[in-house]
Amino acid sequence: MSFTRKKGFYKQDVNKTAWELPKTYVSLTHIGSGAYGSVCSAIDKRSGEKVAIKKLSRPFQSEIFAKRAYRELLLLKHMQHENVIGLLDVFTPASSLRNFHDFYLVMPFMQTDLQKIMGMEFSEDKIQYLVYQMLKGLKYIHSAGVVHRDLKPGNLAVNEDCELKILDFGLARHTDVEMTGYVVTRWYRAPEVILSWMHYNQTVDIWSVGCIMAEMLTGKTLFKGKDYLDQLTQILKVTGVPGAEFVQKLNDKAAKSYIQSLPQSPKKDFSQLFPRASPQATDLLEKMLELDVDKRLTASQALAHPFFEPFRDPEEETEAQQPLEDSLEREKLIVDEWKQHIYKEIVNFSPIARKDSRRRSGMKLQ
């Protein structure tokens, strides 16, 4: 049998999966698995830094899997912002395209995510700092022409110094159900995405930030719908049933008829809904949890809100130097063609300097 693994690589079984990686990465520890792959922490011997390594699950099983793998690699390569996860390294044990079956993404290691710590009581200054970082990351992602579409607490990595990075952006497309057989949680999704009832824009992510911030204030999920219709019912209980001006904007006839059939109900008083929040916090929430996408705040507008005054540094609110160029986005390629494109990206990859915060908040999560 011919030897197909590159020199300098070693093999280790992790959680019943074979990992093959360069000898520069040691102390492999399994930290999680999902629909698209498994993640281990490791130490990079060159820097002594702890990193996260993701092995994609069967990236070339089908055209859909291969396209998603290509897009994930492209997105991670493009993102260079302290509040957005980026790529430190990418490698394959394959010595040529012919025996290329797997590849691994190396990213900064983060201790936990918001999902795991949602039960803790967040002080207002912690909420300010964490939400400010979410919005800085979104401003950058949006300026690259990317929309997250599936922002939720589990996609927000945090470390013990309250530093936050956005994960899994730009991947939540219609392929989710086809690939995994289940619908990703809808509790944080904007109504226009859940129901496809009107055009949507980058402010879909601002709605999600509103839901997450509300949960940090109360310790409870704001809109916990059992299904699509129940999700809408939960939302309208808070936002009120919209009037004729909003209904005119709906593209979907069924949604139009349904909304028109509902009895008018007023918007809830946010100061009563969030009694421990400051007036500035409730004002920001109202502007992020706005049903009408044309009236909802953008990331830039939200960053300028007085709620963030204690932490704001406009110089850190940077935009991408150029939009993400995904010339293959609309291409229908076969698996072998996707494989060629991915292999080329891996071979040509050169690491870039990390973008990390120049300042420290002095805050601790616990």
UniProtKB/Swiss-Prot annotation:
The active site is at residue 150. Activated by phosphorylation on threonine and tyrosine by dual specificity kinases, MAP2K3/MKK3 MAP2K6/MKK6, MAP2K4/MKK4 and MAP2K7/MKK7. Activation by ultraviolet radiation, hyperosmotic shock, anisomycin or by TNF-alpha is mediated by MAP2K3/MKK3. Inhibited by dual specificity phosphatase DUSP1. GO terms for molecular function: ATP binding; MAP kinase activity; protein serine kinase activity; protein serine/threonine kinase activity. Dually phosphorylated on Thr-180 and Tyr-182 by MAP2K3/MKK3, MAP2K4/MKK4, MAP2K6/MKK6 and MAP2K7/MKK7, which activates the enzyme. Dephosphorylated by dual specificity phosphatase DUSP1. It catalyses: L-seryl-[protein] + ATP = O-phospho-L-seryl-[protein] + ADP + H(+); L-threonyl-[protein] + ATP = O-phospho-L-threonyl-[protein] + ADP + H(+). The modification Phosphotyrosine is found at residue 182. The modification Phosphothreonine is found at residue 180. The modification Phosphoserine is found at residues 47, 350. Residues 25-308 form the Protein kinase domain. SMART domains: S_TKc. GO terms for biological process: intracellular signal transduction. GO terms for cellular component: cytoplasm; nucleus. InterPro entries: Kinase-like_dom_sf, MAP_kinase, MAP_kinase_CS, MAPK13, MAPK_p38-like, Prot_kinase_dom, Protein_kinase_ATP_BS. Interacts with MAPK8IP2. The TXY motif contains the threonine and tyrosine residues whose phosphorylation activates the MAP kinases. This is Mitogen-activated protein kinase 13. The gene is MAPK13.
